[in-house]
């Protein structure tokens, strides 16, 4: 095989059609490309749609964290400042992350949509994929690949105090500033 596909979109089946449409448009700063016949196509970039909603004619069972299936979708921002801007914007609208995690390789905020699906907003903590891969093959990541919880409220304070971004985006900083937060794996799987 010589052709490599690129990811196009995710389709979510829902009985909370309007709430899901509005949530994804808000969280991803996206817009509806098409809506009708129980379908909604949403995009935030050059692709004609990145998220699609399939409206169920009857009420669906709630998300079951104990069932097999996709756990979350993830969306990357260019800078910590961009991620913080989105965090602050969403917070002002009453949308707060359920699980902030310093993975080491990424700094991530996990939200839950109205159906309970996780959506990760993140930044890469390394400049290149090779650097990220090297970190993932190193001892810190090998010892704790999920990472540690942190309080995103503390990041703007740290930046204002002159703490470098490459320090804030580490396990060590998260553990120093918020040592008593619960294991993020529990929140991600419940």
Curated annotation (Swiss-Prot):
SUPFAM superfamilies per the UniProt record, alphabetical: Glyoxalase/Bleomycin resistance protein/Dihydroxybiphenyl dioxygenase
Q: Which residues bind Fe cation?
A: 9, 72, 120
Cofactor(s) the protein requires to work? Fe(2+)
Top-level taxon of the source organism: Bacteria
Its encoding gene is what? bphC2
Q: What does the subunit comment say?
A: Homohexamer.
Q: Which UniProt keywords apply?
A: Aromatic hydrocarbons catabolism, Dioxygenase, Iron, Metal-binding, Oxidoreductase
List each copy of the VOC domain by range.
6-124
Q: Does the keyword Transport apply?
A: no
Query: Could you tell me the EC number(s) of this protein?
Result: 1.13.11.39
This protein is called Biphenyl-2,3-diol 1,2-dioxygenase 2
Q: Name one GO molecular function term.
A: biphenyl-2,3-diol 1,2-dioxygenase activity
């Amino acid at each position: 095989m010589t052709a490599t596909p690129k990811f196009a979109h995710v389709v979510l089946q829902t009985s909370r059609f309007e709430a899901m449409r509005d949530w994804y448009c808000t969280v991803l700063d996206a817009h509806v490309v098409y809506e009708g016949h129980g379908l909604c196509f949403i995009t935030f970039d050059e692709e004609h749609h990145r998220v699609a909603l399939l409206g169920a004619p009857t009420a669906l069972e709630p998300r079951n964290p104990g069932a097999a299936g996709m756990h979350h979708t993830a969306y990357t921002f260019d800078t910590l400042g961009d991620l913080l801007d989105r965090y602050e914007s969403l917070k002002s609208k009453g949308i707060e992350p359920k699980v902030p995690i310093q993975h080491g390789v990424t700094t991530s905020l996990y939200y839950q949509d109205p159906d309970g699906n996780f959506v990760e907003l993140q930044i890469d903590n390394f400049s290149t994929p090779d650097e990220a891969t090297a970190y993932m093959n190193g001892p810190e990541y090998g010892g704790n690949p999920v990472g540690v919880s942190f309080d995103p409220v503390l990041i703007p304070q740290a930046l204002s105090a002159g703490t470098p971004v490459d320090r804030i985006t580490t396990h060590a900083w998260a553990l120093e500033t918020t040592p008593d937060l619960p294991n993020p794996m529990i929140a991600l799987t419940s």
